[in-house]
């Protein structure tokens, strides 16, 4: 019996406190009210920590129970709840008869709070001998004037009827008559809840009698009504037509909780288009009006689940514009989920309206500065990108909006715009002229070398005809005066360069106009100095100094030492010159353009070697520029083909590979969707390992199963299947030990549950058999398991919870301590290793996101490849399987045998941590028996994640070597 007493809390007590039972009795007997309160608190703590003081019960009955103090009354309710009420043979203690009489007096007390709290306490009693004499007093409380007493009396009768129905055989009739005469909503809710579980027929009769007034009830009663309707209709589908109108009415309830539950119930009862639309509209309204972001995300998940249902998706497509109203929420996660949902639902009839809304959202981001504004712009760019590829008709309207992002200071959004432009210009030849035109206009306003580099590549690859000269002109404008070294020398000497003359000429007209309008003091502004006096400062004297250091963007990149943009610019100019030569028949014009282009390249080389830039040009960039110069001077057919044909073909192949990968993932997703066919066999829960439920599942059963399973990603079969449990059993002791122990390790999302089986293999009774555990790593034991008594050859199960807070490898170790008639013995347990793989799930991200995370994460772990594998592809498969990561590099990019392989891998933990890995391996092509060599670089935000993943890779390599 003692092992089954519930332990509600554990309160730490200082070790220095010495507990004396005689002192406790003296304080309880002779102390004043405050002393009795403090002593009673100490007794409660000691009882909760496992101490036993049977001699105190009579003292408390004689000297504490009669005290009419509310604090003492509250503490006594806790004391009587936790104190052992039975003797060693399981019989009720004689002293409890006196306590029972005290309960009866409290139930008749004029103070309604004391009555109500006593009734709540009676719900926790498990001794029918104590409850039986109190039944008349409990029944009398149903007629009390105060609702607090009445509603707790209903709960007490409900609990007693559920546990000991023979104590109140007429419970349902009693509560049904109480419900008919009751006006208080909390009392009606508790009474209706009892009828729901004890006598559904009476609950249905009551609901049918007042079904037209349901919308006037309080939210607590409406929630119980929704639960009743769901259970009844799920058990008896013929009742749907009787109560579905009530659910429709509850969709308009003033309580958001009732509306949420009603919408979820409605779509499980009916798949009619009107029902789906009403439920989805209700969900959308909840997301829009609810301020809590967690609630928004939960309701959005429900909408996503509805969308996954094939029959519901078509109905929800007309609600895309309503879904986009959620974008008014400032939270980036809510916006991300909303845009993903809208993208899945949009179709040809409403894509135009959706693009208009997204364009308005783009305009809003220009005037709002928020920490997530840059991420939101990036989301909008990607959404418009997907819309344009999915529906090419809107691409022409989207391109002008997106090109504006190129001048944005947020490099991520601008990079995504260029990714979109690159794909659109390849897939939609009709839009190339429009895209090039807008790109040329935006080119001088770009502020990032990375964006300029990508824009230069697109212009060089796809510009045609007369636009070639326009592109070269805008490049020259953005590059500045050529030769650049001479221009920088003049700038250093204080002479005016060509661009300074142009800037001064354009500014001179403005200055003359302003001077004509104002007086002599019109070009000066007053400034306040530190001592409070005014100082005059001329705008004309300051402006030239500021403008003296201002250079064109491309020139500034080169002066900062970024000559990679110079190499990319040289390749683009080479392509333009070669294409112009194909179009222009006159040799003189060809040569003029070629020499102009070669002058720019040689000027970049000269500048890189001159010492003016902060960093000199690298050998790699020098070689690239020399290749371009040599190609223009020699004009070999092979080199011309590389510049004019192969680059575009490579892009086309890459986009095709991405499209094939997306289609493959879409097919896998469709295959994973469970579809019930007419001839599918009926599955019995006891005989099956579990199965993905349909949307029309019993949500109460599934929520209970999910709560038991713990892990969000664990299927029911992973928890319920005996086979899966056997795979996770760890033997803790040997078969020859006096105590045999084995543990089933159940890894949940935030904790680990150890279900330990302990078997007494001796002929002796083991007293105080205690499982003592300790942890190593980022693990924490939640509570110490209670000691048990094991009879000869008896066994028991002990559960221990271990809290997990991060993705790291951990070790659980300990021993079993037990007492026999002669001495105390200890059995040391085998260690339990907690695998990091239980917390890592494969995930995917874009190349841009991968590079950004790789740049941001500071912890890196480099693992050297040491394996017996001789095939690069086999080693990659082994690595993905052992680390549970996803390979982001397309399969086509990895195909073939060239003796070298590089791949990116990505995974996420259930705690939201990201793990990146880059594989770089090689082997000689001419030696098929040679082993794979190379290294794996792991990056993560936390050190523990990087080290744990590296340890996992190293251990998997050792296992493969030993197996070989």
UniProtKB/Swiss-Prot annotation:
Disulphide bridges: none
Region (Disordered): 490-530
GO cellular component entries: COPI vesicle coat; Golgi apparatus; Golgi membrane
Bilayer topology term: Peripheral membrane protein
Keyword Aminoacyl-tRNA synthetase listed: no
Stretches with biased composition (Low complexity): 512-526
Superkingdom of the source species: Eukaryota
PANTHER family: COATOMER SUBUNIT BETA
Note in the entry: Brefeldin A induces dissociation from the Golgi of betaCOP and presumably the other coatomer subunits.
Protein name: Coatomer subunit beta
């Amino acid at each position: 019996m003692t092992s089954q007493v519930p332990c509600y809390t554990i309160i730490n007590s200082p070790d220095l406190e010495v507990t004396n039972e005689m002192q406790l009795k003296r304080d309880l007997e002779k102390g004043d009210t405050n002393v009795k309160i403090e002593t009673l608190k100490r007794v409660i703590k000691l009882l909760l920590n496992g101490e036993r003081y049977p001699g105190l019960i009579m003292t408390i009955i004689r000297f504490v129970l009669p005290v009419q103090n509310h604090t003492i009354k509250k503490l006594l309710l806790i004391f009587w709840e936790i104190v052992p009420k039975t003797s060693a043979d399981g019989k009720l203690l004689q002293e409890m008869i006196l306590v029972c009489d005290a309960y009866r007096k409290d139930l008749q007390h004029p103070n309604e709070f004391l009555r109500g709290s006593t009734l709540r306490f009676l719900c926790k009693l498990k001794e029918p001998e104590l409850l039986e004499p109190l039944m008349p007093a409990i029944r009398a409380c149903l007629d009390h004037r105060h609702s607090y007493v009445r509603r707790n009396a209903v709960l007490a009768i409900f609990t007693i009827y559920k546990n000991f129905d023979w104590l109140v055989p007429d419970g349902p009739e009693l509560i049904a008559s109480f419900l008919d005469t009751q006006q208080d909503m909390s009392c009606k809710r508790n009474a209706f809840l009892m009828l729901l579980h004890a006598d559904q027929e009476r609950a249905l009769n009551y609901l049918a009698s007042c079904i037209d007034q349901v919308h006037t009830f309080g939210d607590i009663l409406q929630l119980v009504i929704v639960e009743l309707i769901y259970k009844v209709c799920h058990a008896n589908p013929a009742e749907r037509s009787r109560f579905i109108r009530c659910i429709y009415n509850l969709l308009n309830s003033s309580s958001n909780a009732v509306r949420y539950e009603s919408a979820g119930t409605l779509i499980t009862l009916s798949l009619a288009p009107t029902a789906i639309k009403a439920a989805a509209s209700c969900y959308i309204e909840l997301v829009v009006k609810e301020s809590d972001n967690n609630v928004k995300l939960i309701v959005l998940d429900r909408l996503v689940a509805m969308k996954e249902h094939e029959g519901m998706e078509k109905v929800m497509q007309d609600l895309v514009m309503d879904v986009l109203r959620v974008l008014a929420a400032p939270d980036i996660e809510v916006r991300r989920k909303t845009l993903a949902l809208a993208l899945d639902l949009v179709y040809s009839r409403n894509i135009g309206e959706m693009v208009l809304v997204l364009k308005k959202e783009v305009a809003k981001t220009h005037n709002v500065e928020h920490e997530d504004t840059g991420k939101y712009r990036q989301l909008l760019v990607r959404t418009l990108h997907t819309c344009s590829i999915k529906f090419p008709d809107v691409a022409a309207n989207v391109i002008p909006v997106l090109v504006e992002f190129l001048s944005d200071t947020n490099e991520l959004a601008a990079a995504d715009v260029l990714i979109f432009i690159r794909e659109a210009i390849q897939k939609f030849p009709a839009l190339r002229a429009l895209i090039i035109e807008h790109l040329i206009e935006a080119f001088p306003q770009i502020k990032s070398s990375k964006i300029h580099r990508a824009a230069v590549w697109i212009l060089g690859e796809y510009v045609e005809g007369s636009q070639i000269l326009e592109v070269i002109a805008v490049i020259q404008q953005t590059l500045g005066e050529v030769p650049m070294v001479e221009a920088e020398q003049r700038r250093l000497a204080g002479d005016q360069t060509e661009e300074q003359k142009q800037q001064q000429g354009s500014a001179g007209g403005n200055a003359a106009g302003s001077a004509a309008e104002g007086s002599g003091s019109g070009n000066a502004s007053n400034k306040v100095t530190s001592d409070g006096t005014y100082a005059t400062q001329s705008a004309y004297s300051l402006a030239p100094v500021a403008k003296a250091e201002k250079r064109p963007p491309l020139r500034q990149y080169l002066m900062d030492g970024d000559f990679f943009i110079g190499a990319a610019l040289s390749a683009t100019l080479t392509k333009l010159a070669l294409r112009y030569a194909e179009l222009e028949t006159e040799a003189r014009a060809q040569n003029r353009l070629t020499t102009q282009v070669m002058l720019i390249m040689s000027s970049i080389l000269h500048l890189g070697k001159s010492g003016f830039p902060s960093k000199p040009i690298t050998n790699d960039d020098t070689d690239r520029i020399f290749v371009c110069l040599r190609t223009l001077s020699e004009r070999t057919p092979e080199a011309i083909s590389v510049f004019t044909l192969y680059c575009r073909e490579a892009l086309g192949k890459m986009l095709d590979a991405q499209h094939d990968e997306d289609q493959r993932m879409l097919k896998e997703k469709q295959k994973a969707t469970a579809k019930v066919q007419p001839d599918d066999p009926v599955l019995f829960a006891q005989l099956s390992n579990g199965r993905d439920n349909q949307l029309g599942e019993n949500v109460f059963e599934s929520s209970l199963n999910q709560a038991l399973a713990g892990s969000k990603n664990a299927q029911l079969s992973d928890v319920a299947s005996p086979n899966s449990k056997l795979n996770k059993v760890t033997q803790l002791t040997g078969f020859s030990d006096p105590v045999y122990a084995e543990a089933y390790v159940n890894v949940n999302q935030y904790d680990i549950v150890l279900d330990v089986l302990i078997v007494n293999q001796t002929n002796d009774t083991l007293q105080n058999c205690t499982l003592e555990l300790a942890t190593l790593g980022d693990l924490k034991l939640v509570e110490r398991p209670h000691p048990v008594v094991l009879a000869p050859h008896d066994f028991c199960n002990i559960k221990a919870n271990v809290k997990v807070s991060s993705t790291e490898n951990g070790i659980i170790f300990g021993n079993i301590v037990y007492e026999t008639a002669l001495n105390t013995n200890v059995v040391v347990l085998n260690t339990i290793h907690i695998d990091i793989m239980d917390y890592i799930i494969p995930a995917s991200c874009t190349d841009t996101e991968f590079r950004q995370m790789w740049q941001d994460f500071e912890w890196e772990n480099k693992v050297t490849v040491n394996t017996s594998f001789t095939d690069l592809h086999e080693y990659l498969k082994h690595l993905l399987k052992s680390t549970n990561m996803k390979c982001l590099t397309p399969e086509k990019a990895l195909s073939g045998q060239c003796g070298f392989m590089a791949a990116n891998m990505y995974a996420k933990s259930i705690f939201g941590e990201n793990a990146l890995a880059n594989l770089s391996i090689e082997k000689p092509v001419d030696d098929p028996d040679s082993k794979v060599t190379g290294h794996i670089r792991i990056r993560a935000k936390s050190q523990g994640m990087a080290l744990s993943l590296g340890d996992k890779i190293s251990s998997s390599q050792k296992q493969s070597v030993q197996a070989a």
